[in-house]
Swiss-Prot record:
Top-rank lineage group of the source organism: Bacteria
Biological classification of the source: Bacteria, Pseudomonadati, Elusimicrobiota, Elusimicrobia, Elusimicrobiales
Name under which the protein is recorded: Deoxyhypusine synthase-like protein
Entry annotated with the keyword Transferase: yes
Matches recorded under Pfam families: DS
Gene Ontology MF: a single term: deoxyhypusine synthase activity
E.C. numbers: 2.5.-.-
GO cellular component, one term: cytoplasm
Keywords: Transferase
Family label: Belongs to the deoxyhypusine synthase family.
Length: 375
């Protein structure tokens, strides 16, 4: 029997393809019919309508939350279409979706259909093939992704950065290299939509950071997670209303919900998130946040209960329906994006100016002190 190679598993004819919601105008009538059914179908219909309400509310900033491995599963184009059509204003995600999967594909690499039932994971390991349930990835290509992040970090001024700033630099790099025009990172960069990855070191970017900081131990780029939280809180305070569109749970879900509490700590009267939709298969009974209900979040003062909906379904089934419904209802057509990248960059510029003024003031005091001593 011939020894198997990478080519036996990474078949160019068996690629994961990203679904195009623009093709499915019939999703509107289907989802509306779901309203007259029961169980998860009715929940999904209500969730779809709540998302459409977010888009129709001109003062509402929509934050998309992504957890798990959704981009490798074929949902990338949905997120890109939401960005292109001003249907989301900020993204909070796991690093896997943004770096290991979206940036990975922006470099020209692909995800392949696999076999979760008959996979020999020891053989896959020997062949440098990584498995995400029923999907395969070339590990050697993933290492190129790690190294590319490393190279980008080497070009930056050594200082603390929010993940949003690093991802913006990655978008800038893609533009310069003329790569990834169909990627989330590049599209968000082009549209002025910030992407936050609170656990940024927990992905390919983390390997890039390890290499960068080892190579430059005394002067390097660092991650400022508190700045991520502050920037997202500033968006919450700036927005008249906010809506959360959460696909899966995890850190992104809690991170954005907590901005209401953070705003309160800063003495700002910022209302609870007015709209909230979550698609998840997680169970609430273990006390973990991924499965905690949105009603539970209301007890913490984070989410209003009037317009919230949990949908207990796997994301690759529910997300195309919810987003296709909203896309073909066309409330987004009269909606303008908030360009929160510009908002945050302007804020950074003000802070930099304040620092410069403080520095000049300190230098003047030192100079005056030296003159006094000479006298």
């Amino acid at each position: 029997m011939a020894k198997k190679t990478q080519k036996d598993f990474l078949n160019p004819k068996e690629l994961i393809k990203h679904i195009d919601i623009k093709k499915y105008s019939q999703a509107v009538s289907m989802v509306e019919d779901f309203s007259n059914m029961a169980y998860s179908s009715r929940d999904l219909a209500r969730a779809s309508k709540i998302y459409n309400m977010m888009l129709a509310d001109k003062g509402c900033a929509v934050v998309l939350c992504l957890a798990g491995s959704l981009i490798s599963a074929g949902l990338k184009k949905i997120v890109v279409d939401l960005l292109e059509n001003n249907m989301i204003d900020a993204i909070v995600s796991t690093g896997a979706n943004i770096v290991d999967q979206d940036f990975f594909e922006a470099l020209g690499y692909k995800h392949y259909k696999g076999d979760q039932h008959n996979a020999d994971d020891n053989l896959l390991r020997d062949l440098h093939i990584d498995r995400i349930y029923d999907t395969y990835i070339n590990e050697d290509e993933l290492k190129v992704c790690d190294e590319t992040v490393h190279k980008i970090l080497n070009t930056l001024e050594p200082r603390p950065y929010s993940s949003r700033e690093i991802i913006w630099e990655m978008g800038k790099w893609l533009e310069a290299k003329k790569k990834g025009k169909d990627s989330i990172i590049y599209t968000a960069y082009k549209k002025g939509v910030p992407i936050f990855v609170p656990a940024f070191a927990d992905c390919s970017a983390g390997f890039g950071f390890v290499a960068h900081q080892t190579e430059r131990p005394t002067s390097h780029v660092t991650l400022d997670g508190a700045k991520d939280f502050l920037e997202l809180t500033k968006i919450k305070i700036n927005a008249k209303e906010t809506g959360l569109l959460m696909f899966a749970g995890g850190v992104p879900k809690n991170f954005v919900q907590d901005t209401v509490v953070a705003a309160e700590i800063l003495g700002q009267d910022s209302p609870m998130h007015k709209y909230a939709v979550q698609v998840t298969v997680a169970d609430e009974r273990d006390g973990a946040l991924s499965g905690s209900t949105l009603k539970e979040a209301s007890s913490w003062g984070k989410v209003s209960t009037a317009l919230e909906q949990m949908v207990y379904a796997e994301c690759t089934l529910a997300v195309p329906l919810i987003t296709a419904y909203a896309y073909h209802k066309k409330a987004w057509k009269s909606r303008k994006g908030f360009n929160y990248i510009k908002f945050l960059q302007n804020d950074d510029a003000k802070i930099a100016k304040m620092k410069k003024q403080e520095c000049c003031c300190c230098e003047s005091k030192k100079s005056a002190s030296k003159k006094a001593k000479k006298k």
